[in-house]
Amino acid sequence: MPTISQLVRKGREKLLTKKKAPALKESPQKRGVCTRVYTTTPKKPNSALRKVARVRLTNGFEVTSYIPGVGHNLQEHSVVLIRGGRVKDLPGVRYHIVRGTLDAVGVQGRKQGRSKYGAKRPS
């Protein structure tokens, strides 16, 4: 237990919380260019081929981000918008690509939960 004079001299040190999406630099989204588009397998109890892309952001960071939805048109040099949000069964994937913006087209034939996949309202 510190004395009052010790607290006057030093003060308490603030506990710093770790950022969940450091590459965004406090922004809600960031733009970037795909450097590699590939599939990867998830952690132990799950089995699939998850679509991910390595993205070089406008602030110089290079991050791995998940491509949500069924089917995509992304390839190398595609310009995408990324948001925060990790994928629990893919280690190191802490970002999602926003569908329906820039070069990432929305999911075709999507009827429910359309806003998350950039799908237009079916007429």
Swiss-Prot record:
GO terms for biological process: translation. Keywords: Methylation, Ribonucleoprotein, Ribosomal protein, RNA-binding, rRNA-binding, tRNA-binding. Gene3D superfamilies: Nucleic acid-binding proteins (2.40.50.140). The modification 3-methylthioaspartic acid is found at residue 89. GO terms for cellular component: small ribosomal subunit. The keyword GTP-binding does not apply. One of its GO terms (molecular function) is rRNA binding. PROSITE patterns: RIBOSOMAL_S12 (PS00055). InterPro entries: NA-bd_OB-fold, Ribosomal_uS12, Ribosomal_uS12_bac. With S4 and S5 plays an important role in translational accuracy. Interacts with and stabilizes bases of the 16S rRNA that are involved in tRNA selection in the A site and with the mRNA backbone. Located at the interface of the 30S and 50S subunits, it traverses the body of the 30S subunit contacting proteins on the other side and probably holding the rRNA structure together. The combined cluster of proteins S8, S12 and S17 appears to hold together the shoulder and platform of the 30S subunit. Belongs to the universal ribosomal protein uS12 family. Part of the 30S ribosomal subunit. Contacts proteins S8 and S17. May interact with IF1 in the 30S initiation complex. NCBIfam families: rpsL_bact. This is Small ribosomal subunit protein uS12. The lineage of its organism: Bacteria, Pseudomonadati, Myxococcota, Myxococcia, Myxococcales.
